[in-house]
């Protein structure tokens, strides 16, 4: 799994497969750490040969490590410093401001829960298996997990993503490729397909089992945001393969061919047509005493993309309405400001047509009413000490969403 604190891809790929390779046999047998490690190393070596054969490549020397769930959370599920913690708290305010998280939930805790679900992880040329979550005696699922992880070892480094949406697109290529390789291995092994578990058609060796009940449950919205690269990414990579085999997949790692938006992942025809995000400006504020906060990627603004919009709307509306209202996304500019203990963020979204802009405007209006926020009857709402505003510029086919702890900062006259 390609992930970082705050759910982003890092330059040194951290890749993981989810809890799901634990079997009843392991629970009853409970092998010693020595037997466990010997078995894991055995199928690890077998999987390495399989990846080299399937991809017609040679993998570098790769080391296998056995760690505990607590060690995994300490390594990848906690902030790396004060700035990282600040970014997590800002992101939590964004999620809550857009009603993606209830007020009593913690994004810090969600990060740890996400890591606690991992079964294996890859960092550079080192692969880690989490003993509580991974059963090397369950075949062929366990070997398929190593095929997934070893694919990450092979994958070339991608250009550093500048935005949230670009990061999700890059991660979809990385995780989609690794998940597709796991499927290729399973087909070669001629194993019986495992019935659908809990997330679309992803094999259970990448999903939680009944043991995941011991893990603090993640919010559906956060799970859907972060599972997108595995689910939709595999479908995207399968489409690449159908257009030219592994050569087309390999080409996608080259600069100029790497997917840049979640829209391209959802609609591969837009990838092949090289339809990228349109540049969108941030609105000018009426006051200049707000401090611009850079993103965790060092940028002055972010882009959240079509998939994020879809998940936000689907949290309150039916899935078909959310999908239809997010289709037609053309680009967006998300800018975050602070002033003392107050915050303001603006989200200027460009749409392909006036109809697309209208559909989102209506869907967002209905979403806000569904949240129980107190509205003024037009385009302003208040909830939990935050004020939310939406505007539709029919001349530019844009919609502006603004959220702030300061009511005067979300008035229509505040933005130009």
Can you say where each PLM-predicted feature lies in the sequence?
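C-terminal soluble interaction/assembly domains
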Residues: 341-416
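Secretory targeting signatures
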Residues: 1-31, 51, 416
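Pan-zinc metallopeptidase signature
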Residues: 217-341, 348
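Catalytic glutamate of the conserved HExxH
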Residues: 145, 149-153, 157
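Acidic helix-start/capping segments at beta-turn-to-alpha-helix junctions
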Residues: 60-80, 165, 170, 197-205
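Catalytic zinc-binding patch centered on the HExxH motif and its immediate surroundings
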Residues: 73-87, 104-128, 136-137
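Post-HExxH zinc-binding segment in Zn-dependent metallohydrolases
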Residues: 154-210
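Short pre-active-site segment immediately N-terminal to the catalytic Zn-binding motif
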Residues: 127-146, 165-170
């Amino acid at each position: 799994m390609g992930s970082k604190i705050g759910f982003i891809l890092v330059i040194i790929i951290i890749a993981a497969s989810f809890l799901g390779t634990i079997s009843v046999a392991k629970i009853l047998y409970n092998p010693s750490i020595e037997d466990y490690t010997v078995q894991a190393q055995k199928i690890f070596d077998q999987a390495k040969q399989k990846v080299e054969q399937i991809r017609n490549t040679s993998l570098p020397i790769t080391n296998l490590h056995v760690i505990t769930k607590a060690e995994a959370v300490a390594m990848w599920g906690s902030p790396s410093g004060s700035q990282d913690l600040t970014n997590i708290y800002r992101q939590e305010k964004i999620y809550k401001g857009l009603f993606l998280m209830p007020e009593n939930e913690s994004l810090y805790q969600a990060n740890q829960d996400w890591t606690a679900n991992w079964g294996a992880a890859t960092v550079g040329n080192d692969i880690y298996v989490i003993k509580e979550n991974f059963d090397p005696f369950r075949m062929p699922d366990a070997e398929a997990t190593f095929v997934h992880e070893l694919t990450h070892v092979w994958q070339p480094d991608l250009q550093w993503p500048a935005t949230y949406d670009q990061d999700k697109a890059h991660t979809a290529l990385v995780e989609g490729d690794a998940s597709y390789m796991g499927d290729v291995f399973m087909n070669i092994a001629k194993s019986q397909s495992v019935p659908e578990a809990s997330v679309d058609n992803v094999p259970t060796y990448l999903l939680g089992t009944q043991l995941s009940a011991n893990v603090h449950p993640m919010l559906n919205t956060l799970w859907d945001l972060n599972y997108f690269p595995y689910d939709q990414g595999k479908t995207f990579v399968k489409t690449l393969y159908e257009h030219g085999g592994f050569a087309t997949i390999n080409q996608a790692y080259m600069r100029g061919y790497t997917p840049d938006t979640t829209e391209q992942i959802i609609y591969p025809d837009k990838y092949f047509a090289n339809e990228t995000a349109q540049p969108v400006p941030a609105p000018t504020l009426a006051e200049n005493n707000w401090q611009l906060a850079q993103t965790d990627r060092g940028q002055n603004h972010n882009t959240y993309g079509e998939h994020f919009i879809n998940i936000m709307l689907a949290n309150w509306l039916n899935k078909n309405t959310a999908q239809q209202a997010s289709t037609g996304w053309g680009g967006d500019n998300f800018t975050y400001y602070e002033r003392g203990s107050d915050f303001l963020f603006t989200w200027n979204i460009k749409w392909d047509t006036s109809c697309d802009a209208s559909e989102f405007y209506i869907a967002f209006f209905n979403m806000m009413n569904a949240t129980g926020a107190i509205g003024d009857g037009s385009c302003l709402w208040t909830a939990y000490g935050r004020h939310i505003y939406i505007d539709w510029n029919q001349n530019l086919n844009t919609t502006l969403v603004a959220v702030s702890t300061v009511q005067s900062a979300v008035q229509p006259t505040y933005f130009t």
